[in-house]
């Protein structure tokens, strides 16, 4: 994706920018039916029990029937996936054409489901038949995995590493260099290193080619010790202060406005983040999600005034709301990398009469408490500036979801989400997402903080890597590893000239 058109590093990309898929093209053959045409030169790995046969439309039908309980003997959706329960049917039109039908949702809903991380992890029917049973529905032995991607799994040590070997029968070519068949790298190892300090030491020694999800401090330290390394940034999501909106005094919007106006976002961006953060408030979707958000630069002056730093105005609003001074507990994860930022927030709130008592919790316990809506104060969270598919963002304030730990019950918001889900065209969906961003900004359910950059570091000989999301790591695994890693390569001459021979 040309970054001048759309920020390719986000987890969400409009489907018109998708390339390198097993499907060559697709179209809406009906209001809620997608017809896809598959490549005719895609083969499963040349391992038993599939032995390198051609990938066909029947493989796609089997995968979705099994995943969502639509046929082939499967009557219930797999518990591991709920995103597409509305899918009604999948039909092989011919050997290389597949039709997907839904009962009546928007085209954007369909494409977000189809092109999201869960949209295409097809498994060979022969492998499922051979290695699963009614009591064990998934393949648990990595030796039995069969795919058709650019790399074959040749070793796996649980909790330590996965080794990948080039699939010489892979169909793909590099979109940037169309004559080059993929993948470039013959052998690749994905390491699982829980201690970041250990991982960074291995990077410094030239033992690891790339690492991402680094903090500003870690990136600064790496730049000081290894100035020749390539350093990259990509957009993160902002931290937020999340009040329980059904608990006084946060039921009064003036209190939430005051809490926003008490925070000096530009100063935090320039000092705490050393100028590497977006210094203005965020709305539901990331400010970098061009065409799908509501950037601060487009806000009217009246709305900006309820967000801009103004401690005097904040005190006046608190007094008008009958909350000139109050104390509240802020729950936060003890694993948060921004606890120092929380100390700054605590100080700025104290200046307007708000006492914040910080309660650190285990991350899992905190998540459980928030989803159960048992928090009675505020939380240090990440509820704005989402970088994933935009319709997912609505759910964080939808009345009926566990993601709504702010306890918002807003009929207008729920109705707007329903309209977005049912919008008949992409343009209408996009307009409703922008409208949702505007409405969220006006309600000020959450207090926004600057949007930081996330840092990645790679060796100078590691080419083709541009800190693409999910390309080398991820909390749920390297979701886009097959696509991106097949397009990376090693400049061996440069590597050897730097004294690295392995």
Where do the PLM segments sit?
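Acidic-aromatic pocket-rim loops
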Residues: 282-293, 364-422, 465-469, 474-476, ...
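N-terminal lobe/hinge region of extracytoplasmic solute-binding protein
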Residues: 1-30, 146
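Surface-exposed binding/hinge segments that line
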Residues: 27-31, 35-40, 73-131, 150-157
């Amino acid at each position: 994706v040309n970054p001048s058109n759309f920020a390719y590093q986000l987890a969400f990309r409009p489907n018109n920018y998708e390339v390198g898929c097993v499907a060559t093209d697709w179209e809406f053959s009906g209001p809620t039916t997608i017809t896809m045409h598959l490549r005719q030169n895609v083969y499963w790995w040349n391992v038993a029990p599939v032995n390198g046969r051609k990938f066909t439309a029947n493989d796609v039908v089997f995968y979705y029937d099994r995943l969502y309980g639509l046929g082939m003997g499967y009557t219930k959706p797999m518990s591991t996936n709920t995103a597409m329960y509305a899918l009604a049917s999948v039909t092989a039109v011919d050997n290389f054409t597949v039709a997907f039908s839904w009962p009546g949702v928007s085209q954007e809903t369909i494409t977000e489901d189809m092109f999201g991380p869960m949209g295409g992890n097809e498994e060979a029917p022969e492998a499922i038949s051979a290695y699963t049973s009614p009591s064990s529905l998934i393949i648990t032995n990595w030796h039995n995995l069969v795919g058709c991607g650019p790399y074959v799994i040749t070793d796996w040590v649980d909790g330590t590493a996965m080794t990948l070997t080039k699939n010489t029968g892979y169909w793909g070519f590099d979109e940037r260099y169309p004559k080059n068949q993929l993948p470039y790298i013959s052998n690749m190892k994905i390491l699982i290193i829980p201690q970041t300090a250990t991982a960074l030491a291995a990077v410094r020694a030239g033992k690891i080619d790339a690492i991402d999800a680094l903090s500003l401090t870690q990136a600064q330290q790496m730049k000081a010790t290894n100035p020749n390394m390539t350093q990259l940034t990509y957009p993160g999501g902002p931290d937020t202060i999340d009040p329980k909106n059904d608990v006084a005094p946060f039921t009064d919007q003036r209190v939430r406005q005051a809490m926003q106006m008490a925070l000096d976002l530009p100063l935090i961006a320039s000092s705490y983040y050393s100028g590497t953060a977006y210094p203005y408030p965020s709305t539901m979707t990331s400010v970098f999600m061009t065409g799908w958000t509501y950037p601060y630069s487009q806000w009217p002056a009246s709305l900006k005034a309820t967000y801009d730093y103004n401690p005097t105005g904040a005190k006046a609003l608190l007094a008008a709301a009958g909350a000139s001074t109050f104390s509240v507990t802020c729950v936060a994860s003890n694993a948060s990398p921004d606890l120092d930022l929380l100390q700054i927030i605590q100080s700025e709130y104290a200046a307007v009469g708000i006492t914040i008592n910080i309660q650190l919790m285990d991350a899992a316990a905190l998540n459980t408490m928030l989803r159960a809506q048992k928090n009675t104060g505020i939380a240090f969270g990440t509820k704005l500036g989402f970088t994933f598919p935009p319709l997912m963002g609505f759910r964080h304030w939808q009345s009926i979801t566990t993601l709504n730990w702010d306890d918002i019950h807003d009929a207008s918001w729920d109705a707007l989400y329903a309209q977005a889900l049912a919008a008949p065209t992409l343009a209408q969906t996009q307009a409703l997402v922008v409208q949702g961003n505007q409405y969220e900004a006006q309600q000020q359910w959450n207090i926004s903080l600057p949007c930081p950059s996330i840092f990645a570091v790679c060796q100078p000989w590691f080419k083709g890597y541009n800190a693409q999301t999910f390309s080398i790591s991820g909390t749920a695994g390297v979701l886009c590893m097959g696509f991106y890693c097949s397009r990376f390569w090693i400049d061996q001459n440069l590597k050897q000239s730097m004294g690295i021979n392995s």
